[in-house]
Amino acid sequence: MATCWQGLWAYRMYLLVFLLPISLLPLPILVPRKEAYCAYAIILMALFWCTDALPLAVTALLPLCLFPMMGIMEASEVGLEYLKDTNVLFIGGLLLAIAVEHWNLHKRIALRVLLLTGVRPALLILGFMVVTAFLSMWISNTASTAMMVPIAHAVLQELNNTQSNVEEGSDNPTFELQEPSPQKETSKVDEKDNGQAQPLPAVPLESGEHMTQEQLRFSQGMSLCVCYSASIGGIATLTGTTPNLVLQGQMTSLFPQNPNVVNFASWFGFAFPIMVILLLLSWLWLQILFLGINFRKNFGIREQEHEQQRKQAAYRVIQTQYRLLGPMSFAEKAVFILFVILVLLWFTREPGFFHGWGNLVFSDASGRVMVSDGSASILIGVFLFMVPSKIPGLTQDPDNPGRLKAPPALLNWKLVNKKMPWNIVLLLGGGYALAKGSEESGLSQWLGNKLMPLQHVPPPATVFIICLLVATFTECTSNAATTTLLLPILASMAQAICLHPLYVMLPCTLASSLAFMLPVATPPNAIVFSFGGLRVSDMARAGIMLNIIGVLVIMLAINSWGVPMFQLHTFPSWAHSNSTTHCLASPPTAPSP
């Protein structure tokens, strides 16, 4: 009997792949309508995503075959959803992120900021959080965490091991950061990130048996501050994490008449304050939880001499690592300049409060802007393949003396093909296909009619419940899959109750990044947990409070500065459809400005 159960468990994924579609067949058979056919496809994909029976990207391809076979959409129409402008923006942004990582610019920025903040306990945690959050705004959460955790643990080990050396009159100024070697990296890759999938490093933290209780708690706080700030930092920019791009794509797909409400500038103006507030509150919470409330000690005020010497030794670790990078190379300078140019192009294309370069240069006769944020990102991405990585000159080929050799470009396609997370591109496309199929089949209108009773529930209460549910759900499932499934439903609900769609879609998107409680919730958590020194209970205890804080901050944002920014107190004309005629006859249910 035991062998039978073991066999079933071993083949559980194969069983799920065949049994789930069969078990759902009564729905389209008993209700032979397009709405039921589309619901069958959505439920099937949701179950595949939740159970990991198929890879996320493979599941995202199902609309390409299911929708045409069920008569919901033509195959050519479904295919168009897989490379929309949002996907182009994602690809262009990641081209620059790959260049930043390839030329080690992110490490130089990180170490420089840590040299400025110093190594006092509270400021050290703040320094790591600020650096990780900033990096996660522009590159993968996983990549920023994988880079920052070894640096954090190198500093921790120096702080823990230097006291005896200081007492003997010696220190360890030549300590070198031990990066995880390729041979020791695990092959496990998690797709639940905002972009680039990375191997999980398998470098363990020093055993807690040789630490004092105070040292162990400080190391736990340092580890958690890195993974938490990676998730928080991704909130701030439109390209920072996949759910943000899912929202922009769903807005374009579900409400094609909207005047580009969600763009890089508008998202940054709304989400950056959320990131700052959440980062500061998280810093205070981790400080209280792991360092105690002795702020004088945490900030290094009136320290004893041996404590100062220990921190000086740890500071030298960071200095040594920064010196090992050498002077800033031409490639780093070129990537940094292109990075600044791209950010400026994103902010000034169509800022809203003045005419940007998109309005002034690239608009048609009717005044419609012809370029998008994706256009700017691809333009800079192409330049990465055109700009040489060294100052052009008469460079000798080291393999063939006497022959000239041109330096390589900042990026090459082999590197991009290896680093680019094509699975996320397909996942985004699958989400847009689901939204379009739901609209074409009439399922969105049917859901909206069924959700009409929610019109009598206060909008803030509705949003609060949505945030709690999403924050809980995203602890166990991909944040991208969560938003892909829920945003079309929430959009239909908003139309049904005459509520601005962004009033429920924005909180859902932001809450999907509140994955703080479990190691499996997001790759940054898994990376930190794999280094050792943490128990699941440690992460859950710290994370549950951060989830609550995050939900409250989102509620504050959506009911304060979010209202005038997105005009959330009105029901927009671009959200009107045949199912919202009742919204014209009655005042919209919306939050007060």
Swiss-Prot record:
Regulation of its function: Li(+) decreases succinate transport in the presence of Na(+), by competing at one of the three cation binding sites.
Record's GO cellular component terms: apical plasma membrane
CDD domains found in the cross-reference section:
SLC13_permease
Ranges in coiled-coil conformation: none
The reply on keyword Ion transport is yes
Top-level taxon in the UniProt lineage: Eukaryota
Note the PANTHER family from the entry. SOLUTE CARRIER FAMILY 13 MEMBER, SOLUTE CARRIER FAMILY 13 MEMBER 2
Q: Please give the family membership noted in the entry.
A: Belongs to the SLC13A/DASS transporter (TC 2.A.47) family. NADC subfamily.
Q: Can you name this protein? A: Solute carrier family 13 member 2
The record lists the lineage as: Eukaryota, Metazoa, Chordata, Craniata, Vertebrata
